[in-house]
């Protein structure tokens, strides 16, 4: 699972490769076509692998939908999301244990368009700022909307870790389910 920080580093590396291509193209005897063919081929190969992996994963999700009841599928995807959240434990979640406001501030700086916390009501509402699904396994238009149950597991694991209390996550809106954005409502379980 790639995190946002690694993704941004990868983007920076590809930009640096583009700048390197420009510099190579300025050298005597070089053409822009031969100066960057390797970098462009590598980028194309990586993108092809990503696309193929996402399509295969979408097929895997479809197989799960056919073979498991809705209840079993939800548990499976929820557990998958919880496991994914664990990969962020050391780098993100543990830093904000007991500091939900600090976590929400970091989220607003990086991946949340909106975040509200009503401590008295025990609710947190998050609006993701990304115009596309942030899961690197998802290919919009191919991955079934049922896979959004995975992100509910991620949200529950992340917020229960930070708050030190069990929570329940609901999806108010989802890109995969036809929405314009992803919106989560997190409720602390009393």
Protein language model annotation of sequence segments:
Residues 21-62:
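C-terminal segment of N-terminal export signals and the immediately downstream linker at the start
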Residues 181-188:
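C-terminal edge-of-domain segments
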Residues 1-15:
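N-terminal secretory signal peptides and thylakoid transit peptides that target proteins
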Residues 148-152:
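Active-site nucleophilic cysteine motif
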Residues 65-147:
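Amphipathic interaction/junction segments at domain boundaries or subunit interfaces
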Residues 170-175:
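Short, solvent-exposed loop/turn elements at beta->coil junctions and helix N-caps
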Residues 159-167:
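Short secondary-structure junctions
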